[in-house]
Amino acid sequence: MPVEYLVDASALYALAAHYDKWIKHREKLAILHLTIYEAGNALWKEARLGRVDWAAASRHLKKVLSSFKVLEDPPLDEVLRVAVERGLTFYDASYAYVAESSGLVLVTQDRELLAKTKGAIDVETLLVRLAAQ
């Protein structure tokens, strides 16, 4: 089954809490290498603030991340072009570029990225779509 959705770090964080609702559709979901580091940084921050046990959270994150196909990194010049044209960060532009150039639906919780990426959806919409399949 082909990949249909590109999940950014904000969506990954939200999806981690709903593992049972999407895991059977994992072959439709992909991330970027960047997503791994962004998710790790969010985990680091939560651990530093004492909100999570880093070891347990790390095990869960590893399980979640291993469920996704990791896509190739996009051409940096194209990502920079999208970032400048749309007023996005380089990180966000990488998701927008890959989703649009690959015909994937971007899944994000970032309002600006939702507004500036053609066809982007949030996690709630993704879960509804997957449940209907």
Swiss-Prot record:
Q: Which residues form the PINc domain?
A: 5-113
Residues binding Mg(2+) are D8, D92, D110
Gene3D superfamilies assigned to the protein according to its UniProt record, in alphabetical order:
5'-nuclease (3.40.50.1010)
Q: Which UniProt keywords apply?
A: Exonuclease, Hydrolase, Magnesium, Metal-binding, Nuclease, Toxin-antitoxin system
Outcome of L65M? Answer: Facilitates structure determination
Name the InterPro entries on file.
PIN-like_dom_sf (IPR029060), PIN_dom (IPR002716), PIN_Pae0151-like (IPR044153), TypeII_TA_RNase_PINc/VapC (IPR051619), VapC_family (IPR022907)
In what way is its activity controlled?
Inhibited by EDTA.
Q: Sorted alphabetically, which CDD domains does this protein's record hold?
A: PIN_Pae0151-like
Can the keyword Metal-binding be found in this entry's annotation?
yes
GO MF entry, a single one: magnesium ion binding
Q: Which cofactor does it need?
A: Mg(2+)
Question: Do the record's keywords include 4Fe-4S?
Answer: no
As recorded in UniProt, its EC number(s) are: 3.1.-.-
Family in the record: Belongs to the PINc/VapC protein family.
Q: What function does this protein fulfil? A: Toxic component of a type II toxin-antitoxin (TA) system.
Quaternary structure note = Homodimer, 2 of which then form a homotetramer.
**Name of this protein:** Exonuclease VapC9
